[in-house]
A protein has these predicted regions:
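Juxtamembrane intracellular "pre-TM" segments in multi-pass secondary transporters
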Residues: 14-24, 200-233
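Hydrophobic core of transmembrane alpha-helices in multi-pass small-molecule transporters
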Residues: 35, 115-133, 236, 316-330
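Loop-to-transmembrane helix entry/capping segments in MFS-fold secondary transporters
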Residues: 59-60, 146-158, 260-261, 343-355
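Helix-to-loop junctions at the C-terminal end of transmembrane segments
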Residues: 76-89, 174, 277-289, 374-375
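Structural signature of the two symmetry-related core transmembrane helices
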Residues: 92-106, 292-307, 387
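Cytoplasmic helix-loop-helix junction between adjacent transmembrane helices
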Residues: 123-158
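A late C-terminal transmembrane helix in Major Facilitator Superfamily
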Residues: 349-376
């Protein structure tokens, strides 16, 4: 009898070790998915201006093409969400695999000497990659809701770390070896993305159909979730703010007396500072209400843009880039968790897809207008407009939070 407690204790210890191993394995695999997702942004979208400029595009032309890509991405995200909601055999996992394969094909085709083919494939890549965050977030949130021990905030932090590394490396390689390096790095990122999806397959299959039936039948989604709709409007304005800087960072850096290498370093700094806040998010969310974190992060979008406006050197831009720890770094993780609580559990796929669609909508508006603003008014006007959009976005998010949570806070998934 004396040995029984010891046996039970050992069994519990072994189970605890197994749970930890599963958590590490699941988080590592999902981290590869997030790294692939955000590394695409660092390699292809961040250097789209460089690539298109080399092919004879003006700032307005770059803005129009990237704006069109964002519009296509918005349509793709809504299409993917509706198809997954209605077709039981189609999952976001399948969509993710297919998307990574298409991205690999487009990355290879960008090397073509046929300008029309190369530009066309670059356009497809820019469109599809903007749908990847929604796909990845839906995969992760479904798996977590179905019982997966995946640490989302850690994986998302690894995604930012991957963005930082690839942005810095891409900047160096483009400056020294030419814009064609974007294609080779795109193939590397595709391999990472596919590896992550295959390794994570055992976690996501359990939750892939969790929210299909209810979502397919529900009508008037926005009418039933008014606070979410207001939040989504705010998210669009924040994405306009964010994209006006990231998508035209090359022109901004040139105005601040910098180079393509400085552009890559600034982008890398913006991403690397996100990592600590994402890793620490589970602990922060236990002490600070999630709604407060979302509102706080919204204000910092405007603060960062204003700092970019004030500084006049590459060094100043590096300092301004570091402020992303409190803007996009905190927002991107807090918003995903907050939205999961704004809507019923059965509508997670649709809500996450709409949240992710805020990025291409904001991208479409910012890229459509950004090029014309640069050509007609200049860099400083672009940064001022970005600041105003940040303030408007923060205001909408505050209204959404007040409307939804009057006296009751929404708990964050990653605080559990």
């Amino acid at each position: 009898m004396k040995g029984l407690p010891t046996a039970v204790t050992l069994f519990k210890k072994d189970m605890g070790i197994m749970d930890k191993r599963r958590k590490i394995k699941a988080t590592a695999a999902y981290s590869l998915v997030q790294i692939g997702t955000w590394a695409y942004y660092a390699v292809i979208l961040s250097f789209a201006g460089n690539y298109l400029k080399e092919h004879g595009f003006t700032d307005s032309g770059v803005g129009l093409l990237l704006g069109a890509a964002a519009a296509v991405s918005f349509v793709l995200q809504i299409l993917f969400a509706e198809l997954v909601s209605r077709l039981k055999r189609l999952t976001m996992y399948t969509v993710g695999i297919a998307s990574a394969i298409v991205m690999a094909a487009c990355s290879a085709a960008v090397l073509s000497d046929m300008t029309v083919l190369a530009i066309g494939c670059y356009f497809i890549a820019c469109s599809l990659l903007q749908a990847l965050p929604g796909i990845g977030n839906t995969i992760g949130m479904e798996a977590i809701e179905a019982g997966s021990p995946t640490a989302y905030s850690v994986a998302r932090g690894m995604g930012s770390l991957g963005y930082s590394i690839f942005a810095y490396v891409t900047g160096l390689l483009v400056a020294s070896m030419g814009i064609r390096m974007v294609s080779y790095l795109g193939l590397v990122v595709s391999a990472i993305m596919l590896a992550g999806l295959f390794l994570y397959s055992s976690e996501i299959r359990t939750g892939s159909a969790a929210s299909v039936t209810k979502e397919a039948r529900s009508g008037g989604f926005f009418r039933q979730n008014k606070a979410f709709f207001i939040f989504l409007v705010g998210a669009v304005f924040l994405c306009i703010n964010h994209n006006l800087i990231t998508c035209f960072l090359y022109r901004i850096m040139l105005f601040k007396q910098g180079t393509a290498a400085d552009q890559g370093l600034a982008a890398g700094i913006s991403a690397i500072v996100e990592v600590p806040i994402m890793f620490l998010f589970p602990y922060i969310a236990k002490r600070i209400p999630c709604k407060a974190l979302v509102c706080f992060s919204g204000l910092w979008f405007a603060v960062k843009s204003l700092c970019c406006f004030i500084v006049s050197t590459p060094g100043g831009m590096f300092v301004a880039s570091a402020l992303q720890i409190f803007s996009w770094g905190l927002y991107s993780i807090a918003a995903v968790d907050h939205v999961s609580k704004l809507v019923p559990a059965g509508e997670t796929v649709r809500a996450q897809s709409y949240l992710a669609s805020a990025a291409p909508i904001g991208g479409f508006i910012s890229m459509l207008c950004g090029g014309f603003i640069l050509d007609s008014l200049g860099v400083q006007a672009l940064l001022l407009i970005s600041t105003v959009c940040g303030l408007i976005g923060a205001a909408f998010i505050l209204v959404s939070v007040i409307k939804k949570d009057r006296g009751k806070d929404s708990n964050c998934l990653n605080a559990n």
